[in-house]
Amino acid sequence: MSTGNIEAGVYYESDGSDEHIKKLREYFEKIKEEYSESFGDDLLGFTVNPVKPQSFEFILVGNDDIGLHSYVEVKLQEGIVLGKITSIFAYDMGFFANPFTSQESSVFAPVEDFKTIFSKGKDDEWKKAAIYAYLNNNGNKLKIATADVIGILKDGKLDILRNPFHVGEPVYKISEKTLGKILKKNFSGRDMEVPVKVGVIENSDIDVFVDANEVISKHMLVLGTTGSGKSYFTKRFISSLLESDKEVEVYVLDPHGEYFNDLKSYIDEN
């Protein structure tokens, strides 16, 4: 419920008339529709302090499938905030919290517990067994993920998030519907004029596009470390562009022969 009790029980003593039960059920459904919130299976967690316009952190709630570089969304009244997970940390709020870090002083176990296990005279195998036993009997574990904000989707356009949203907002795995609204749009928020497929989003079958009109009419620089896939991306883009439009002419300066073998089928012998 958005206000009032989180949980509520209703007891009704019927006089045997089904009509009373029917009216009560209709009334309850009306209240539920107006004031309750259903999170759904795509819920990943809830935001925690601090939330910034550039990034936010959230506690994961039982979803072990989510990983680095996954895309997430936060649904607000003014739009949908899009983010990309950049880190995930696993924490233990009991014995395995660091007792020598002041920031965790309120959650770590008593130092005496460490002295008991790591004191002199204890066999190494005994120490391993003691720690393993504690770990498997301790339920005070959680994971916290950090996500960089990509922007906020408003009326089909991707804009900069200028103000932080509230702590405690639900965080969801990004939906295909949301991705479909942005993957064929350019940076201005308009639909791509010539969308060219260059790959798929990691761990999915969702296609990713580049607006060929933006590339051809302007300058584009492909940057990356050695082995990150600069040449592969460029070859993929050129081949997809040539397949989508036979009238396009591309000139490649290839002193090291990186492109010839992969693109020779597109060469006009004349």
Curated annotation (Swiss-Prot):
The keyword Thylakoid is assigned to this record: no
Record keywords, A-Z: Plasmid
Coiled coil region boundaries: none
Top-level lineage group: Bacteria
Pfam families: DUF87, HAS-barrel
UniProt keyword annotation of Mitochondrion present: no
PANTHER family named in the record: HELICASE MJ1565-RELATED
Entry protein name: Uncharacterized protein aq_aa31
Gene source species: Aquifex aeolicus (strain VF5)
